[in-house]
Amino acid sequence: MKVRKSLRSLKKKPGAQVIRRHGKVFVINKKDPRFKARQG
């Protein structure tokens, strides 16, 4: 998982889901797990 400043480009990818956990924003992509990231 990468830690990124901006998730805007990742959430446009096909299969991307934006999820909030414990006040942090995550992008999870089951189609392409390379694009899994947390905002920080």
Swiss-Prot record:
Pfam families in the cross-refs: Ribosomal_L36
UniProt KW keywords: Ribonucleoprotein, Ribosomal protein
One GO cellular component term noted in the UniProt record for this chain: ribonucleoprotein complex
Entry's Gene Ontology molecular function annotations: structural constituent of ribosome
Record-level GO BP terms: translation
Signal peptide residues on this chain, from the entry's feature table: none
Keyword Isomerase: no
Superkingdom of source: Bacteria
Family: Belongs to the bacterial ribosomal protein bL36 family.
Protein name listed in UniProt: Large ribosomal subunit protein bL36
